[in-house]
Regions:
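Hydrophobic transmembrane alpha-helix bundles
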Residues: 26, 60-69, 101-111, 134-140, ...
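Charged, elongated alpha-helical interaction scaffolds
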Residues: 136-252
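Flexible glycine-/small-residue-rich
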Residues: 41-44, 70, 103-104, 132-134, ...
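Venus flytrap/periplasmic-binding-protein-like
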Residues: 124-137
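Phosphate-binding glycine-rich loops and their immediate beta-loop-alpha structural context
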Residues: 4-110, 115-126
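Structured core elements
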Residues: 38, 100-101, 131-133, 237
Length: 252
């Protein structure tokens, strides 16, 4: 009954909480650009087709790489099939950013395969963020509770990823504009500095020439004074020498 299913879900969640793994997947960070997506679904499921169509025809033109890891989405073999798909993804863990587990609608009883302890424990401890879109508005499974992010439909899962990439693209565009504006401001500042230098250079040259002319005139004046003093000294010495010669002359 539905009551039994709800009780079983609570028991599994309590067990996972006691084991300390209930929120491990939720604690992972979705990469900045989650564009490499491992999809666990049925190849013939309408939900899988909706998911791929939504990604491929997003209005932003963003690229997404998706790879399907087929699994049964209803029946008694859901647990075994999804676990096998997760094992295959785990073997290539570095090739993907996120895991998306999706299926179309169906009866609530068809979701029982997603309410098992083994599947919930595996997803809770999976090394990549898991996004689930396996039910409708009123459906909530144990898998939904342990997944990083739970949405209602495959289309909503696609929109979540598109929105994430669009946010990053918008941020990068804003950053690019700020860098461009900063570059223009620096160029304008340098242009003004060069213009200022261009107006100052003639004045600087004129002042340097004036200073040099003044220094030259001062040096010329000093040289004349030194020369006059030297000539006067030499003339005085010559006069003294002539006087001595005259005093020593025998004709005197």
């Amino acid at each position: 009954t539905l009551g039994d299913m709800a009780r079983r879900r609570r028991e599994i969640l309590l067990q996972l909480e006691e084991e300390g793994v209930l929120t491990l997947n939720k604690e992972l960070e979705i990469p900045v650009l989650p564009q490499r997506i491992a999809v666990v679904s049925s190849a013939t499921a309408a939900g899988y087709g909706d998911f791929c169509h939504q990604l491929q025809h997003n209005s932003g033109g963003f690229f997404f790489y998706t790879e399907l890891f087929p699994a049964l989405m209803q029946g008694n073999q859901v647990e075994e099939s999804v676990l096998a798909a997760l094992d295959r993804i785990n073997a290539r863990i570095n090739e993907f950013d996120v895991v998306v587990i999706i299926r179309g609608g169906g009866a609530t009883s068809d979701l029982s395969g997603f309410d098992t302890y083994l599947l919930a424990a595996a997803c809770a401890q999976f090394p990549l963020p898991i996004i689930t879109g396996i039910g409708h508005e009123r459906d909530d499974t144990v898998l939904d509770s342990v997944a990083h992010t739970r949405v209602k439909t495959p289309t909503a899962a696609a929109e979540l990823l598109i929105h994430r990439v669009a946010e990053v693209a918008e941020h990068l565009e804003e950053l690019s504009m700020r860098i461009q504006q900063g570059a223009y401001m620096l160029l304008d500042l340098e242009r003004r500095r060069l213009e200022t230098l261009q107006t100052r250079i003639p004045n600087l040259v004129h002042r340097k020439l004036a200073d040099a002319r003044f220094s030259l005139l001062a040096a010329k004046k000093d040289l004349l004074q030194v020369t006059k003093a030297l000539v006067a000294r030499q003339s005085h010495r010559l006069e003294l020498l002539q006087q001595r010669i005259a005093d020593a002359s025998p004709d005197k």
